[in-house]
Design a protein with these regions (language model features):
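Extreme N-terminal segment that seeds HTH/winged-HTH DNA-binding domains in transcriptional regulators
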Residues: 1-47, 83, 253-259
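Beta-hairpin "wing" of winged helix-turn-helix
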Residues: 26-31, 58-68, 72-74
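Active-site-proximal glycine-rich helix-loop-beta segment
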Residues: 44, 61, 222
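Extended, compositionally biased flexible segments
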Residues: 47-48, 58-59, 65, 83-94
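Short, hydrophobic-biased segments on the C-terminal half of alpha helices
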Residues: 54-55
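All-alpha effector-binding/dimerization core of bacterial HTH-type transcriptional repressors
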Residues: 75-259
Length: 259
């Protein structure tokens, strides 16, 4: 029930109510949402308020508008697990999805100063650059750019990276044991290239994940940069507070960096 005496806008209250109905399974992915007219009559609000709530949820990715058909509950967002070191292929398979990669670039290059520093290399040390568009059920979900020191896995530039997990390849063929990744998460928007690649609107909210993966010897073995669709992903974090406010080895940590 909406509280008309609350300072919280009615459209926002209605949007939260609809999200709760989705969360509880009262309305399911693929179900058609009630019309503006029915929602306005049901909650004794104006059609404009109902329209605002629907538009808000559509922008959030909870609803999807289908031209000439109406508004429907969107498929749930994929949860990117940051607590366990999984590649995209492993993550999607764990969720029961079908992971596909389109390799846009796979070659040996010299690293930029930023990549060289993160991988503890000189700028004349060759790295394998792999750029892949990652899809699930034919929907582009993320654009991933990866740099791996060429000496770590000889021949990586010739591997079929459209059909296999990089992490599995590094562990099985490269003999590495991956331990952890240091990552940063940042809100961004789709530029012209990304909007065309993903088939989304220019300026659509996106998520930028950057980081470095290390092996059991704390040696950097991968620098990665991934652009995720903001309407299809959410990220899972877990934090534990230290009573003494000291670092606690082995626990995931979340930090905030002000730009």
């Amino acid at each position: 029930m909406l509280n008309k005496t609350s300072p919280i806008p009615l459209y926002y209250q209605l949007a939260e109510l609809i999200k709760e109905q989705i969360r509880l399974g009262e309305i399911k992915p693929g179900d058609q949402l009630q019309s503006e007219r029915i929602l306005s009559e049901q909650h004794a609000i104006s059609r404009m308020t109902a329209r605002q709530a629907i538009a808000y949820l559509t922008r959030e990715g909870a609803l999807v508008a289908r031209h000439g058909l109406g508004t429907f509950v969107a498929e749930p967002k994929l949860t990117q697990d940051t607590l366990h070191l999984l590649g995209f292929t492993e993550e999607i398979m764990q969720l029961g999805g079908n992971a596909v990669s389109r390799v846009l670039e796979q070659t040996i290059v010299l690293p930029t100063a930023r990549v060289a520093a993160d991988l503890r290399l000189d700028t004349d040390d060759p790295v394998v650059k792999i750029v892949r568009l990652r899809l699930s059920d034919d929907v582009p979900l993320l654009l991933e750019t990866t740099f791996v020191p060429a000496r770590i896995c000889p021949g990586l530039e010739h591997e079929n990276m459209a059909a296999q997990s990089l992490y599995a390849l590094l562990e099985q063929s490269g003999g590495l044991q991956l331990k952890r990744a240091r990552q940063t998460l940042e809100a961004t928007i789709a530029n012209d290239y990304e909007s065309r690649l993903f088939g989304v609107a220019l300026g659509m909210p996106m998520i930028l994940l950057e980081g470095v993966t290390c092996d059991m010897h704390e040696r950097p073995v991968e620098y990665f940069k991934a652009i995720y669709r903001g309407d299809r992903f959410k990220f899972a974090f877990e934090s534990e507070r230290s009573v003494w406010l000291n670092d606690m080895p082995g626990l995931p940590r979340v930090g905030i960096v002000l730009a």
